[in-house]
Amino acid sequence: MVNTHVNLPGLDLKNPVMPASGTFGFGDVPAAQKFDLNDLGAMVIKTTTPHATTGNPQPQIAILEDGVLNSVGLTNPGVDQVISEKLTKLRHQYLDLPIMASVGGDSEDDYVEVAKKLSASGLVNALEINVSCPNVAQGGMSFGVHAGVVEELTKKIKMAVALPIYVKLTPNVTDIVEIAKAAESGGADGISMINTVLGMRIDVKTRKPLLGHNMGGLSGEAVKPIAIRMISQVRQVTQLPIIGMGGISTAQDVIEFILAGANAVAVGSAHFEDELAAKHIAENLPAELEKLGIEDINDLVGQVKFN
């Protein structure tokens, strides 16, 4: 019997597969209603902000040959309503499923406020800190591009909450290793990586970008080599748990990410092709491990053999 159980801070996972934040909303999107979320290791909810956010102009999503470009924005009803309605309902439906909430904001105070409220709710097991949000006080640059800002933000949230926190790294930086080290110095319990890669596509007939917001985040197959490279680099400098993401669509991809250094994975864009992608990947994983003669998935973490 192959062991796929993974134990991370705050997250006791029956298998290492979860949906990426935003994929299944707050567990209320049609795809999430079509199967038992207990088939997954955990549920990750959409990024939550202090107040309701409407998102970016349409079109928000462009499906490409080898990925997805999106500028949905952080559409959510605000943290109070997320707790009183969305999370309460989700937790009532799934009493034992590990739930990770994603935290966003325009300022450090926003992050701390949302994190404190989510932590105090008693409805979630861990927090993912989405540092790809624009830092309004610093001219709109993403929080996640400055090591000093990431360290300080992580420290402030860590001091304010009892829950484990996972800092979600943006790949749109010169040196992701420096940012990962900063998150660890700030007290992060784990790292999620990678968020989407900033991109743009243009319709040659209209000469307009495909997205209403012009630029957006690229995810899916196209970013997989970037994600694997960055996870491998970060694994060389930290023992923190890593939740890997970026183009995972098969059980074999999961194994590749774990060899690079991830402990668990999140699946996002694959759901555009198969709305039950995460479920199918989790189901297929034991057989793939068996083929490779692996008895315990945890034995594979970071075991890439460099040339």
From Swiss-Prot:
The active site is at 133 (nucleophile). GO terms for cellular component: cytoplasm. GO terms for biological process: 'de novo' pyrimidine nucleobase biosynthetic process; 'de novo' UMP biosynthetic process. Pfam families: DHO_dh. FMN binds at residues 21, 46-47, 130, 168, 194, 220, 246-247, 268-269. Substrate binds at residues 46, 70-74, 130, 195-196. It is found in: Cytoplasm. Its cofactor is FMN. Binds 1 FMN per subunit. Keywords: Cytoplasm, Flavoprotein, FMN, Oxidoreductase, Pyrimidine biosynthesis. GO terms for molecular function: dihydroorotate dehydrogenase (fumarate) activity. Disulfide bonds: none annotated. NCBIfam families: PRK07259.1, pyrD_sub1_fam. PANTHER family: DIHYDROOROTATE DEHYDROGENASE (FUMARATE), DIHYDROOROTATE DEHYDROGENASE (QUINONE), MITOCHONDRIAL-RELATED. This is Dihydroorotate dehydrogenase A (fumarate). The gene is pyrD.
